[in-house]
């Protein structure tokens, strides 16, 4: 029953003495230790990230137990969440009993099964043991009398930083003091917001810049500065020396580094992300640890050596005995009458059926209830695949869960067919918009762009547009410069006060009107001319990636996307590629609402590029030769789904054929109705909307324009499943905006490559999004980002609470919570449902080790629906 660190490097030999390590050994240790944190993208390019992406070789249960032990972080839903879900009918008691029975079958014990079951049933009520019982003299005396019971295998073996074990004379924990210093230095080094006073020697790297300044830091004592005065100039040597002087043995080094990375997972995550972006900063994580451990040594050195530093903490048997008294109805008198063997058996069983195990069973029951409800919903609405109505237009939306209600209402109100596809449309591009010199990756962050696409227009039009744009940029730049300058910042309130005061009043009391006025003013001033794209391949040695596509690449990307969604025949007169974006004001998390997968890149640019490619005669001719015949009167257009207001904005409408024009007019006529229905459904889910909304679209625009609105939309909250299959599988099903939907036709995927690509790409993205929402819900203090209203945007990187907290890695409280006590997001691991024959799923699992590992270790759930409609849980 020991709980060793599951992340300790297996190849290290256990030694009790301090040793000097080779540089490559330290490098390997840092790489291995870095698995416990996830890269953290800057908030301006916010990307959903799976907090435990480096730990998937361990099971979800193992990681949950390790985090509970190492950091006291609980990643299972709390008792209040579970009770609330049960009250709302989200957990069926029968599934809990099945989970309990399965757990008992896996255990070895010698007591009567009914005794074990009775104990477990009471414990599963998730009631806390009474404090009066835990502190009772009789119980503690009993624990002392039976302390000979063998609990040697029940030990806490986590490796905590030494600073966390020490308090100074003021009662302050030294790890808190260390964190304060590290946060300060991280902010100084990582600040890319263009501050007037940059960190000196920043170009030499984090460690060297810190070393040049640390001996002048007035926040350190003279003794602490003296320790660091002649410290090594090389980060790797400094890290090795700090580990040695702290007395960390080789066998404990990785666990010790993990402990430090987990102390500030946000800042460490940002450091890790930066280290992956350029060769110049690839050693940044080593430098961070060198700074952190060097400062730890300086702070704790007066307290070294610690007495009993290596003493192992034994598990207290008091709560174990109390649990049998309270839940097992075994009195103290009965305990005294038992043999040592019987006592040991009961204690061991109570130890195994701990709080994490109980919550694990509840989570499994919650997830199984959701799977069964989804199965019943799909089964009740299944239609024959040949029962298709005639459609005048086909619209392809992002798999994003916010597309599901919009698609459902669109199909219900008109003769339309919709598809689900990853919102970058399979185009691995970096985009450069008109008037900009900077390119932005416009694809999921797990991929790298292979082509650069520039927006082009007539030279004179471009100059005129750039001049208009420069006016606005100059005003913003002047304001920012004045704000950051020591002298002009005192004058700024006098100069800008009246204007900003007027803005504050109008924005607060008439947000929709003012927001609309500002948006229209900006649109008129910055009216973008008609543009084209650099679609044709150009060899430019100054560009890291090629500009445009070759003919073969154009055909390949179009073919790949059309086959991925099964659209290779039966084209409607009008096919619309719909990217998505959001609309909010004064929102640090605006990028997260745009697209959590693509680093805040809206999908309109990609949609327009893809539609343009589909209209090229050369592409159509090549596809026709391969059997994909697009009719001459079928036109591809592009639009953008505004998720905050549920509107469709046209961004590319070429010259339409007569029949395509009719389809376009049909969409235009029905769209206001679709928006009203979709907005009503979405707004009713927000807090404080208990009555009927008279004008949903008007109310949605108010939410989007109100700069005091902390929850303009729910984002991807309540996401729970990823359904891969034909639209007929879920058509007419009200999936409540909880499902990622990706079209897939197994009959067109004989090799299984399309399914494998969906799982590797969109499937991974959906899992990351799901687990970020999960983590931000179950452990908001560690993996979330607190209350939006009290956040501080820091150094252009992310948010903090106050000015000296960790860089908060997850989603704000308002993204997952309905109220202070009620969650909105249901913390369930993603259920992937694939519509395909069983042999397709077996082949997928056999060929894709990474995905099989995720399923086996409990990071995702998997189910399938075969051609006859039979559901199977894997």
From Swiss-Prot:
Residues bound to Zn(2+): 398, 400, 580, 595
Cofactor: Zn(2+)
Pfam families listed in its UniProt record: DabA
Matches recorded under InterPro entries: DabA (IPR018752)
Disulfide cross-links: none
Family: Belongs to the inorganic carbon transporter (TC 9.A.2) DabA family.
Protein name per UniProt: Probable inorganic carbon transporter subunit DabA
Annotated gene: dabA
